[in-house]
Amino acid sequence: SENVRASLLAYKMDTPVGPWRGPYSNVHAFSSQCFIHELATAAGRDHLDFLLEMFGNPRWLKPDDIRSLNTERAVGVIKRAAKEGNWGKPMGVREGQGLAFYFCHAAHVAELAEVSVDSANRVTLRKVTVVADVGPIINMSGAVSQIQGAVIDGYSAMVSQKITMENGVIAETNLDSYPVLRIDAAPEVDVFFIESDYAPTGLGEPALPPLAPAVANAIFSATGRRIRKMPLSELGYSV
């Protein structure tokens, strides 16, 4: 079949909850972008070529809504990320690159991650190249900081952040049990913008969703092991 139907269910909880940075986009990006990489691998295709081919001809997915996904803008950030991150360069043993794209909050963002994984499953995220098309940039230093922060935030969540419930109460009460990434594990983050003439979009959240699938795809390239759930600490990985 060429058609897929997806649905969401709103579930009422008795425990107070709040929004996560990027909300549902984080879950969708991780599952969809990792699966696209699996499809490319199964087809024996280069992930970059496979991803670009999916977008087809330049167009707005919703022609009457200029804040919808634009395939030309998507292709633009993906190609730029591949170029700036040197996609396909020779990598050493247990080293790999991973690519991911996601569209949310009217922003198009692509990320390329470089990792190494030692024999004890210690992951080193060496570098993340981020390219975003969010329209005109008014405050460049602020924009760069937003993306750098999103990468660190996203990697923190991917590595070790988990919420557990015990008798209706959240067990993690402070940063000792819900840790944020330390500076010695923080990657180099290269940020680039395609400054189009389209209306400015949000920037506080869009760079977070592509991070986890980019890193997961890089780990597979380095080790041959798929990452299908998070956090990595639950799978025997450390940083």
Model-derived features: positions:
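Cofactor-binding beta-sheet edge motifs in enzyme active sites
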Residues: 1-239
